[in-house]
């Protein structure tokens, strides 16, 4: 019985991810997800307690999917600056290719699970994509002897790359090529590092 329960829970998560991926979070329905899993509409609530908790679990899985996309093709032993440039390009590509997932991860829900203080940004949920980005950004801080606080560095870098991704996926950014994205991220990091050192 426990195995069937875990299998159903995983199926509910994967069907929810596919629903978000194809239709967006605004059109996601717990009833539709239950129906696609062949269970009653109350089953998701039995396993997750509430729609909010279900979305939080789905967000954790989506963040892992985002992490895999963000670090794809990147050697983690290279310097943090180069990693951030490559991660930035992957981030923008993700925004273009996975529009609904980008929307749910970076526009609709991320700040429900993050806390900002004067010192840093912390998460109160498992968001491996953000946690990896944070670790590389803070590694850059150490490698370049940057004097800004952790929170300032994270806010500046995260808001820049998220903003760039929004621009590139809009009609304004249709002419942006991957080379342009890489050059833009590299230039931003150069300006930031030279201005902060």
Regions found by a protein language model. Give the residues of each.
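Hydrophobic/aromatic residues within well-ordered alpha-helical segments
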Residues: 51, 58, 62, 66, ...
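Hydrophobic alpha-helical connector segments
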Residues: 57, 71-100, 153-157
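Amphipathic alpha-helical segments used for helix-helix packing
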Residues: 97-117, 166-174
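Amphipathic alpha-helical packing segments from all-alpha helical-bundle domains
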Residues: 70-71, 75, 116-142, 151-155, ...
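Short hydrophobic clusters on alpha-helical segments that form packing/core surfaces
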Residues: 12-20, 62, 66, 70, ...
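Basic, helix-initiating cap at the start of DNA-binding domains
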Residues: 1-23, 27, 31-32, 36, ...
């Amino acid at each position: 019985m426990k195995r069937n329960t875990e299998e159903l829970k995983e199926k509910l998560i994967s069907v929810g991810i596919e629903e978000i991926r194809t239709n967006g979070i605004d059109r996601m329905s717990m009833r539709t997800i239950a129906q696609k899993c062949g269970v009653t509409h109350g089953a998701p609530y039995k396993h997750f307690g509430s729609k909010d908790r279900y979305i939080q679990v789905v967000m954790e899985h989506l963040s892992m999917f985002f992490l895999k996309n963000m670090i794809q093709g990147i050697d983690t032993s290279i310097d943090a600056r180069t990693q951030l440039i490559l991660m930035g390009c992957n981030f923008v590509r993700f925004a273009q290719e996975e529009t609904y997932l980008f929307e749910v991860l970076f526009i609709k829900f991320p700040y429900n699970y993050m806390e900002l203080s004067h010192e840093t940004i912390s998460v109160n949920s498992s968001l491996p994509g953000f946690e990896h980005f944070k670790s590389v950004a803070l590694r850059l801080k150490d490698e370049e002897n940057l004097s800004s606080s952790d929170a300032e560095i994270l806010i500046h870098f995260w808001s820049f790359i998220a903003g760039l991704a929004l621009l590139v996926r809009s009609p304004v950014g249709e002419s942006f090529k991957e080379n342009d994205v890489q050059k833009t991220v590299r230039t931003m990091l150069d300006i930031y590092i030279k201005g902060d050192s």
